[in-house]
């Protein structure tokens, strides 16, 4: 009976997390695009919309983890897939760093998508947005190397798996899409498509690798 009750509570928590994520994602994406369009002169081509969406997912993940880390009892144990608030407290430093990285990286990706869509009307030029993204990536890499030192064997293996899956997905898409474009069967990728492919593949790899190890199961 206790086991069944625990499973039911776990699935309720998962349903709540999915609902909150869906509402926040759809609402935030709509508001973000609307605000950008309100400036005038913004042409949201599919490539820009996709990259903006990928960046928004990173930012939303960072926001959720950040809120959960800041308030483990009030928010974290309900919003994040953890056993209890104590687990968050134990991992607070790494979770906080991951949260900050996701937030900043997501913002940089959205900025690049917006700057390309807005063109001359953008508050930040595409070149400036690109250099900002490179700086953010440098910081992201530095934080990742710092976190690697404190990872146990499980997290190190998970990180390697994520990298491998990301690379394989990118290679598969590049071969199929590039080959099809060369054969004039479809249009080739736009520059922003390549950026979206890289970070979108990493997002997918995170979920796949975590799911394979049972880390996505309700807790």
Regions found by a protein language model. Name each.
Residues 44-64, 120-137, 195-197:
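Alpha-helical transmembrane segments
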Residues 150-168:
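Membrane-helix boundary/juxtamembrane motif in polytopic membrane proteins
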Residues 27-34, 169-185:
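Hydrophobic alpha-helical transmembrane segments in multi-pass integral membrane proteins
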Residues 59-79, 141-147:
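Membrane-water interface of transmembrane alpha-helices
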Residues 85-105:
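Membrane-water interface at loop-to-transmembrane-helix junctions
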Residues 38-45, 179-195:
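Extracellular/periplasmic helix-loop-helix junctions in multi-pass membrane proteins
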Residues 8-52, 98, 110-111:
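Long, highly hydrophobic alpha-helical transmembrane signal-anchor segments
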Residues 1-15, 69-88, 219:
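N-terminal juxtamembrane cytosolic/stromal segments of multi-pass membrane proteins
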